[in-house]
């Protein structure tokens, strides 16, 4: 009986096909999209999950306190679901669904028995009027847009207590004033260097609790390989 239940949990997402993320955090052994996704998730998830857990813990004075969370540019809503599992009372994922990953988010959340997660298909722009929540995660969105500073300002304004940021940076350039839009080889997006992204972020977000850098080993080009992480307190 135990083995049957365990097998059912491992295969609960099987019919959805390969997914953007591996859901092993939830005890599910699903198939993942081929290519860069596995290696890049291994780089990003430990850092971002740790930041989410820290922000939730520091947002509570009593165990009964409610904590709210929003993931901007959420794709399949993975981190909104992680925040729910780690104790957020309400968790929201927002994405324009350009890459057609959001369509699976509600189904995945339901199968994982996460009943306090909601998803919104909307464009994220400087003029957006989203509700503020205790924790905002902008992880993987800033390098996709034409106006990263304005989107970072929006993200910071939305956060009542903590902002979590992750973005791709170029390892091909190292000068502190480097900025290119569109991103090299792309028709959209942008690129900073490590130094220039750090300089830009510190202008908007003064209270950095922790920062981290690693490489996205699933990306071959130096222009796409750097990954910066920040945990910011309001």
Question: What is each residue range found by the language model?
Answer:
Residues 135-146:
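A short SAM/SAH-binding and catalytic strip from SAM-dependent methyltransferases
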Residues 144-155:
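A short, conserved alpha-helix within the catalytic core of class I
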Residues 78, 82-114:
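Class I SAM-dependent methyltransferase SAM/SAH-binding core
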Residues 161-170:
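Conserved beta-strand signature within the Rossmann-like core of class I S-adenosyl-L-methionine
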Residues 113-124:
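Conserved SAM-binding strand-loop segment of SAM-dependent methyltransferases
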Residues 65-75:
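Conserved class I S-adenosyl-L-methionine
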């Amino acid at each position: 009986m135990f083995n049957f239940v365990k097998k059912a949990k491992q295969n609960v997402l099987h019919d959805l096909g390969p997914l953007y993320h591996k859901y092993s955090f939830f005890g599910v052994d699903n198939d993942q999209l081929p290519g860069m996704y596995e290696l890049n998730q291994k780089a990003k998830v430990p850092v971002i999950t740790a930041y989410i857990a820290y922000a939730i813990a520091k947002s509570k004075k009593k165990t009964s306190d409610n904590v709210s969370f929003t993931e901007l540019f959420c794709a399949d809503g993975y981190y909104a679901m992680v925040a729910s599992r780690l104790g957020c009372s309400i968790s929201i994922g927002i994405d324009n669904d350009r890459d057609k990953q959001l369509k699976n988010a509600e189904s995945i959340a339901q199968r994982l028995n996460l009943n306090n997660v909601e998803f919104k298909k909307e464009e994220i722009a400087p003029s957006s009027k989203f509700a503020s929540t205790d924790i905002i995660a902008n992880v993987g969105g800033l390098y996709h847009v034409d106006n990263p500073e304005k989107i970072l300002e929006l993200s910071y304004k939305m956060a009542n207590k903590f902002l979590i940021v992750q973005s791709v940076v170029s390892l091909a350039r190292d000068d502190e004033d480097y900025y290119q839009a569109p991103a090299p080889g792309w028709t959209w997006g942008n690129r900073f260097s490590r130094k220039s992204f750090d300089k830009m972020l510190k202008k908007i977000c003064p209270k950095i609790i922790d920062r981290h850098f690693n490489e996205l080993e699933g990306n071959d080009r130096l222009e796409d390989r750097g990954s910066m992480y920040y945990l910011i307190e309001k």
